[in-house]
């Protein structure tokens, strides 16, 4: 199995890195051979075996610092070149698993060059992130998402809502889309005692905590949760909202909390 992803630990931009990391290691446990080709950031090794997963990382070069799409296309070229080297030494893969539009052109090129099928996971859509398509870059990404789903034998999404969104946006056949929900590896949290002193930093013992954990970016929707707090407090006077995360909206969200008089 060839995994194509623009992020893989130690590079973590969003949720894709965590999904690919956990999925790859679980597939190894199930007896599969998994190779990840991804972007190299910082001093991460060009090659390593991570609990059975073979991880190849490629450099990338910013031709135009102001154009993210140019950067992504260059990354796709480098992924194709690296995968070609791997195939020359080890032979073809049985399947390409492509994660989001960011690796779509690498996946399509490798499919056509080596006759390998694609399974793609669409973690989110450009239309969904932005409540529609309005700009040229958004249209480009939307079109690339369609192309990836068209080239894929099977498409994976993590919810029935996303399945409906892909059908509406791209006209995909119902049977082509498979819902595989994201999960949590509970073994990472076994044996951890409840830390009441830590909880008391944010709420009294008799108060309820609403916890948000995630990137502080528009598409995660934390702004709507903040906006709903006055209505929640009308019915649940003992509720506290705790937001854990970082991202480009952090200062905007802090200002919104201040403007609404919700901060401590």
Q: Which residues does each predicted region cover?
A:
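N-terminal subdomain of nucleotide-sugar transferases
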Residues: 1-54
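Conserved donor-binding/catalytic core segment of Leloir-type glycosyltransferases
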Residues: 2, 204-220, 226-229
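A structural motif in glycosyltransferase catalytic domains
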Residues: 20, 27, 210, 225-226, ...
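Carbohydrate-associated surface elements
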Residues: 40, 161, 183
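A short helix/loop element that forms part of the nucleotide-sugar donor recognition site in Leloir-type
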Residues: 47, 190-203, 209
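Nucleotide-sugar donor phosphate/pyrophosphate-binding loop at the beta->alpha transition
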Residues: 116-119, 127-147, 193-194
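Nucleotide-activated donor-binding/catalytic signature segment of Leloir-type glycosyltransferases, i.e.
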Residues: 244-245, 251-264
